């Protein structure tokens, strides 16, 4: 399945956002309650007489994992992660050169400290719920991967998948480096991504050859491979030719996805990031799932391929090429890796489809009143994480608990709560089928990042009332009942 071109305008035109001027005790500020970090302290804007001024401030922790909440969640997410692995710093600096563009990327996994619920609220027993099969909406059309299907079940779950890197050295540049040295930080993030999202164990593997494989052609010999685009005959021939060159040197046994890279010194304008595949035959069998990656080239200014070098969009494209996830369009705001623009981890439903979650972590809700305790989606835990309401054979409502941490460590505290959204598998448009459900308050926030329901908030959707009745570091307790 193809990642359509509308993604380019959303990811390559990275926004810039205003931030508060550096705070100083007694200096004027603009709005009561806002906070700002300066010189190792967190200052809060307070009312003093008829004026608004910054208070004396409180010393902040040295760890940037404990970010300070901002007025605009998107401004908060734009902050540069100074604790990112050092190998990503050239990309971070490259991004800053573009008018100090917003860096929405996550670069690492930050463990979430889950606590055990110690309250007295009784939740609905699993035996009183529907079977998980009742909530597994079936995909029967050619649209994006929103539901279960034979195509989905035939794919190896991410937690058990094997990805083969095919590093080629074209006549455009002769490298003295190695693929692992040049791209190891990306593959380490990829392995961390799968391992930490797989609550039930992982044997995921990225296979990286020791050196680049000689491919005696130039990228310029192939038309229409230079940008993010739809499949082309020239691009498919490129895949066939490079595999023919690599086949004598690589054992493709058990492979699920082929990742093509070239030395980062190659001009990024010669090769676009593309998730579409080509049927190729090797000594070990036939394969057709490919992900071609733009060179990590930071020397040629900002071009049409530049936005695809960052970790978030690389992972986004990977989930196009493997599991055929579509773009969730703007129906989710910034929620979900497959949304546009994506600023968070995968949605819980996507994780379930991809095999990161098991059936035991899903609560399929009946029409009768139910109460569920949901463990935060960022916690490394086999606890129940999704509550799903089956509306009909093609539509469900999904409920999950959101906290700061994991790969969502750049979210502000104001984004914590209960995320509610609708899945409609009747949609065949690659950019539709997933829709956020929230209050007027939540939908009015930047990128809808304030959409999660807070304590005592309620929404009504498709005849069901969804309420948050308790919350904490254990997650959220949610009450669901039919209204009609």
Which sequence ranges carry the predicted segments?
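Sec-dependent N-terminal signal peptides
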Residues: 1-8
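C-terminal segment of classical bacterial N-terminal signal peptides
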Residues: 11-19
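Secreted, propeptide-processed cysteine-rich mini-domains
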Residues: 21-35, 69, 76
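Extracellular disulfide-bonded cysteine-rich modules/repeats
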Residues: 39-47
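Acidic glycine-/aspartate-rich tracts in secreted/extracellular proteins
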Residues: 49-51, 170-173, 265-267, 343, ...
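Zn2+-dependent metallopeptidase catalytic core
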Residues: 71-311, 315, 467-470
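Non-catalytic C-terminal accessory/binding modules of secreted extracellular proteins
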Residues: 80-83, 144, 283-304, 369-484
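Extracellular hydrolytic enzyme modules, especially secreted metalloproteases
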Residues: 257, 265-410
């Amino acid at each position: 399945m193809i990642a359509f071109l509308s993604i380019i305008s959303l990811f390559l035109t990275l926004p810039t956002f205003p931030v508060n001027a550096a705070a100083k005790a007694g200096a004027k500020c603009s709005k009561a309650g806002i906070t700002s970090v300066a010189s190792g302290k967190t200052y809060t804007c307070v009312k003093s007489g008829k004026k608004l001024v910054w208070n004396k401030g409180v010393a902040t922790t040295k760890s940037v994992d404990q970010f300070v909440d901002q007025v605009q969640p998107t401004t908060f997410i734009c902050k540069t992660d100074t604790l990112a692995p050092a190998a990503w710093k050239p990309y971070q600096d490259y991004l800053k050169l573009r008018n100090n563009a917003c860096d929405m990327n996550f670069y690492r996994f930050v463990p979430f400290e889950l606590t055990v619920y110690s309250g007295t609220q009784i939740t609905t027993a699993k035996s009183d719920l529907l079977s998980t099969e009742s909530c597994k909406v079936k995909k029967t059309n050619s649209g994006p991967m929103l539901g279960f299907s034979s195509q989905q079940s035939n794919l190896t779950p991410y937690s058990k998948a094997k990805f083969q890197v095919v590093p080629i050295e074209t006549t455009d540049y002769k490298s003295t480096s190695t693929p692992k040295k040049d791209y190891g930080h990306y593959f380490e993030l990829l392995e961390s991504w799968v391992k930490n999202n797989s609550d039930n164990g992982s044997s995921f593997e990225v296979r990286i050859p020791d050196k680049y494989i000689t491919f005696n052609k130039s990228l310029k010999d192939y038309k229409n491979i230079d940008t993010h685009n739809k499949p082309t005959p020239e691009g498919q021939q490129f895949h066939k030719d490079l595999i023919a060159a690599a086949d004598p040197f690589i054992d493709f046994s058990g492979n699920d996805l082929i990742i093509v890279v070239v030395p980062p010194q190659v001009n990024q304008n010669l090769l676009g990031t593309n998730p579409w595949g080509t049927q190729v035959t090797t000594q070990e069998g036939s394969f057709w799932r490919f992900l071609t990656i733009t060179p990590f080239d930071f020397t040629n200014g900002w071009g049409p391929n530049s936005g695809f070098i960052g970790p978030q969009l690389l992972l986004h494209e990977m989930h196009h090429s493997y599991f055929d996830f579509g773009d969730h369009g703007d129906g989710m705001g910034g929620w979900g890796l497959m949304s546009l623009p994506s600023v968070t981890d995968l949605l819980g439903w996507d994780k379930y489809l991809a095999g990161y979650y098991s059936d035991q972590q899903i609560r399929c809700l009946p029409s009768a009143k139910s109460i569920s305790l949901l463990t935060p989606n960022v916690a490394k835990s086999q606890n129940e994480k999704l509550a799903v309401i089956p509306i009909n054979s093609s539509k469900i409502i999904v409920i999950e608990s959101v906290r700061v941490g994991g790969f969502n460590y750049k979210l502000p505290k104001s984004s914590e709560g209960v995320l509610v959204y609708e899945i409609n598998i009747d949609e065949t448009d690659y950019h539709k089928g997933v829709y956020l459900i929230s209050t007027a308050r939540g939908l009015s926030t930047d990128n809808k990042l304030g959409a999660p329901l807070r304590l005592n908030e309620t929404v009504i959707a498709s005849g069901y009332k969804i309420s948050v009745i308790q919350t904490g570091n254990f997650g959220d307790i949610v009450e669901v009942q039919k209204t009609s």
